[in-house]
From Swiss-Prot:
CDD domains: cytochrome_b_C, Cytochrome_b_N. It comes from Antilope cervicapra (Blackbuck). GO terms for biological process: mitochondrial electron transport, ubiquinol to cytochrome c. The chain crosses the membrane at residues 33-53, 77-98, 113-133, 178-198, 226-246, 288-308, 320-340, 347-367. GO terms for molecular function: metal ion binding; ubiquinol-cytochrome-c reductase activity. The lineage of its organism: Eukaryota, Metazoa, Chordata, Craniata, Vertebrata. Component of the ubiquinol-cytochrome c reductase complex (complex III or cytochrome b-c1 complex) that is part of the mitochondrial respiratory chain. The b-c1 complex mediates electron transfer from ubiquinol to cytochrome c. Contributes to the generation of a proton gradient across the mitochondrial membrane that is then used for ATP synthesis. Its main location: mitochondrion. SUPFAM superfamilies: a domain/subunit of cytochrome bc1 complex (Ubiquinol-cytochrome c reductase), Transmembrane di-heme cytochromes. It is found in: Mitochondrion inner membrane. A ubiquinone binds at residue 201. Binds 2 heme b groups non-covalently. Heme b b562 binds at residues 83, 182. This is Cytochrome b. Its cofactor is heme b.
Length: 379
């Protein structure tokens, strides 16, 4: 049989992306998360498809349809929990992937980075809408609180919120459209992922040193295919440990109570992966200010290439920047913790300090540290 790997139009695309792709010889396990995100996306689309076969997007039956999936559908419980915890694994990989990009200066690949930020926004939107679908207490009140934030937009805010709701409150129309969007967005994410990869392969991968690796490349297969398979096995192992031993570890008990518009839960909070942004939102007493800070906390990633003042791409040889990077990681963990706490002393002030620190680190301290390191190079 003739080997069509390099001649057939379709095979050629796959070959140039995953087989004969020249890759740097020194990329570490931090470069595994891209492929893991791809696996997470495929897993979410497949489990989501099977859930959609049994789910009903109606306020009267949504909650009981999820219960029906868990109790009556063959292996419905495992599909449901793989989907719910798969989202958590997705975001763990996302945060690691973005963190890798920040640490090693991958944001200098502008198109790849900007599409990555759009992908992050799209994934967050998808996850938020997915959380509304089981129609539990936290689903309903989470949807109410987060969509209500848009009312802070001057002049058009109130009309915009009612337009999104499809009425005067979160109701049947809201649930139906959220289900429709939650179904279509992963396919848009998949398409954007292809564009993300397309732009990445225009420049080639970065590497830990941040120095051009053109002189030292190895083929993607078998070196990185086997490495990606190992990463995938570890991902699936972690996911299945979570699903089979403590499926509700990352969920909220309130979501096992059917949605009730007349009874507000004592602490409304989103899923754990949104808590850092939620803490930033809550730390500003003004509604519009809070919403702006919330959006900017993610949108600030777009500014990273402009804030890069160092003569070196990577942080590998920049100890001051390294310290600040890990302070930023600690700050984000603090914000995540604060986001899950009630609004009372001392959590309020800790949240405000952590929020100020977050923006201060990215906008001021890290660019200043880079400039200092540039001057130290002259010595």
């Amino acid at each position: 049989m003739i080997n069509t790997r390099k001649t057939h139009p379709l095979d050629k695309i796959v070959n140039n992306m995953f087989i004969d792709l020249p890759a740097p010889s020194n990329i570490s396990s931090w470069w595994n998360f891209g492929s893991l995100l791809g696996i997470c996306l495929i897993l979410q689309i497949l489990t989501g498809l099977f859930l959609a076969m049994h789910y009903t997007a109606d306020t009267t039956t949504a909650f009981s349809s999820v219960t029906h999936i868990c109790r009556d559908v063959n292996y419905g419980w495992i599909i449901r929990y793989m989907h719910a915890n798969g989202a958590s694994m997705f975001f763990i990989c996302l945060f690691m992937h973005v963190g890798r990009g920040l640490y090693y200066g991958s944001y200098t690949f502008l198109e790849t980075w900007n599409i990555g930020v759009i992908l992050l926004f799209a994934t967050m939107a998808t996850a938020f809408m997915g959380y509304v679908l089981p129609w539990g207490q936290m689903s309903f009140w989470g949807a109410t609180v987060i969509t209500n934030l848009l009312s802070a937009i001057p002049y058009i805010g109130t009309n915009l919120v009612e337009w999104i709701w499809g009425g005067f409150s979160v109701d049947k129309a809201t649930l139906t459209r959220f289900f429709a969007f939650h179904f279509i967005l992963p396919f848009i994410i998949a398409a954007l992922t292809m564009v993300h990869l397309l732009f990445l392969h225009e420049t080639g991968s970065n590497n830990p040193t941040g120095i051009s690796s053109d002189a030292d490349k190895i083929p993607f297969h078998p070196y990185y295919t086997i490495k990606d398979i190992l990463g995938a096995l570890l991902l699936i192992l972690t996911l299945m440990l979570l699903v089979l031993f403590s499926p509700d570890l990352l969920g909220d008990p309130d979501n096992y109570t059917p949605a009730n518009p007349l009874n507000t839960p004592p602490h409304i909070k989103p899923e754990w992966y949104f808590l850092f942004a939620y803490a930033i939102l809550r730390s500003i007493p003004n509604k519009l200010g809070g919403v702006l800070a919330l959006v900017l906390s993610i949108l600030i990633l777009i500014l990273m290439p402009m804030l890069h003042t160092s003569k070196q791409q990577s942080m590998m040889f920049r100890p001051i920047s390294q310290c600040l990077f890990w302070v930023l990681v600690a700050d984000l963990l603090t914000l995540t913790w604060i986001g899950g706490q009630p609004v009372e002393h001392p959590y309020i002030i800790i949240g405000q300090l952590a929020s100020v620190m977050y923006f201060l680190l990215i906008l001021v301290l890290m660019p200043v540290a880079s400039t200092i390191e540039n001057n130290l190079l002259k010595w």
